[in-house]
Amino acid sequence: MLLSAKFENIYSFNEETRILFTASKSDQLPLQVSRAEKRDDISVLRMGLIYGANASGKSNIIKCLAIIKEFALNGWSNLKYNYFKMTDEPQERSSIELEFKADNQFFAYGIAFSKGGLLEEWLYKTGSRNDTMIFERKRNGDSWDNTIAPQFLKNEDGQFLKFLIDGTPTKGTFLSEYIKRNGKGIDTIKSARKWFENLNIIFPNTHRTDFPFRVVNDTQFRTGCRSQLGMGNLFYVYWGR
């Protein structure tokens, strides 16, 4: 569940711009809000709709989501994008951060980057009262300053975690490297990474070959489609030769 997204110096976004899907305290439209049930929970909107004039930046929001997903899953791979250029002093440092809910936990994952590659990466566990760092990485010339929350370094996996984050390739992200190298000791990284794996981004030229199989095998997806489309049921029909 996406809670918010922040963009800075990328495409049509100059200064830090944030879009929120969290709910206000208003009770005028109660059916449109999923209210917090626990003290550290967050009330969110059941659905978000982005609208505006042509060329106002709507598509750029989706492009930014696709960029951070690519970073989270595969690291830097010579991604093509444009930083904000309609200024007298253009900067090359861009950043994207998403706040989301996964496995009943709230996270903030962000990256800062330039045309030359990744500059910063961070993952925090967030809540209604405070935020807790899981890890941070900052590029310092040709090296990296890496930090993992102390509680994860105390157990038997701590030494391997330090080795793993220090050995993350310059073009890689720790979020992806942790999974590739079978990292242990920080289950929250697995939850955050899984959220990005399940993040569906559909562009006009996207060919969704998995849709028929999800209709059959994913009960939650099928139920949601039926509810939104007003259909009695959905089936996968195979037309063989």
Where are these regions (language model features)?
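Pre-Walker A-like glycine/lysine-rich segment at the N-terminus of P-loop NTPase domains
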Residues: 2-66
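A broad, low-specificity signal marking well-ordered, structured residues that form hydrophobic/aromatic
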Residues: 17, 48, 96, 173, ...
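Short amphipathic alpha-helical segments enriched in hydrophobics
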Residues: 14, 69-72, 233
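Electropositive, glycine-dotted interaction segments
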Residues: 108-240
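Glycine-centered tight beta-turn/hairpin loop motif at sheet-sheet or coil-to-beta transitions
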Residues: 12, 102-106, 128
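Conserved P-loop NTP-binding catalytic core
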Residues: 34, 41-43, 48-49, 53, ...
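Short acidic-hydrophobic surface loop/beta-edge motif
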Residues: 5, 98-100, 241
